[in-house]
């Protein structure tokens, strides 16, 4: 009978913990899930689709497609740097040159928002690139914090992965 009696042994964080002989320790909370696809799609729709279109196919000669783009499937850091700080000057995508400038979103979007939209784009419309984590965005943001101007294609080529 004594083994069945629970005793209050500690109060942590305002919650009582009961201990009993043979009781198992509680499991750690599971890790936070990757950014939800719905969040990425919502952010894309409100911040990116006006130029890149809901279909990801871009617009005319100004805004490049994201469908099958090497800028999407390449190193995730390149895409994150562009979302954070923008891109200016001509850019070649799928053999076509585009002249529109990409605005910087780093001052507006949080790390988890950038991770969500990058993950969405990297997995939408037949793209099959790995998800981007908020931790990765945070690292890239910290490494480029002093940057105040949009990237150019030439500068992106010089940045090591």
Regions found by a protein language model. Name each.
Residues 33-59, 72-85:
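Sequence/structural segment immediately N-terminal to covalent heme-attachment motifs in c-type
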